[in-house]
Amino acid sequence: MLSAVHLTRRFGNRVAVEDATFEIARGEIFALLGPNGAGKTTTLRMLAGLIEPSAGEVHLSGHRVGRGNAERLRARVGLLTEAPGLWDRLTVRENLLTYAWLHGLREPDQAVERSMTTFGLSDRANDAAALLSKGLKQRVALARTLLHNPDIVLLDEPTSGLDPESAREVRELIVKLRIEQRAVVLSTHNLDEVERIATRVAVLRQRMLAVDTPDALRARLFGHRLRVVVTGHAGAFIPALRTGGHPDVVADDNTLSIATRDALRDTPDVVRVLVQHGAAIISVVPEEHSLEDVYLRLIKEEARA
């Protein structure tokens, strides 16, 4: 649906984004991860057609987006900026109506009423934006982002600074957008949030360090391993495991870490070898690596390069 091809953006001599290539499909939550200044917001703004790339292209449904047809892209994209950007003196209804008019909606009043009902804002319709809590302001900003029913939704730090309940509501909305077959691009520092809802992850530090599903990134960086806890000293069983076809084994006190092609499939054979050589097994579990482990390894590898 939406793709970036060798996308680059420079501000003077500073490179904000370099040679980023990726595709975003319908029904996908695509998470952009990276430290501050990595180019996440700049990437979102290029995808939204708000700034032009210094090099590379944005494609929408196979067609290149440029100066002549940027409006076509904007009509199909909803962008939530990190700051809600509401007019404090206007009411909730007036804020939404202003954007309905800017988008040229045919029935702006009806669209705004539907949106306020959907987002639970009807009872705050006549409240000035300045009087709203941060969570409510974010809810209004999300309603505004989706007012023109975009296919592609770009969210810049949508849960930043929100209380846990408000953040949960935003996550539920994002998942609902995926179910509705919209393409969602999410920029965030919240790795737990990404772990919960993202279908694919891109780690960005000016350039793309990796793009894949969380599980595929884990497998690529750490492989598949079994963690086996035994009674006594685990190192005594390393020779038997290597002879039995498991050459990559590490022992630490009473714990073995064993590389496998498929942890679940290889578990019976590992257990068989250990039991045959007298091991008293306490537990056998696949090793789990968090998305934080993936992220930190990629950032460290890039820093060493």
Feature names for model-found ranges:
Residues 56-66, 72-73:
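Conserved ABC transporter NBD signature motif
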Residues 97, 101-124:
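Conserved ABC ATPase "signature" region
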Residues 48:
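Helix-to-loop junction immediately C-terminal to a conserved catalytic motif
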Residues 171-261:
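ABC transporter nucleotide-binding domain
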Residues 153-156:
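Catalytic Walker B motif of ABC-type/P-loop ATPase nucleotide-binding domains
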Residues 149:
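Conserved catalytic motifs of ABC-family nucleotide-binding domains
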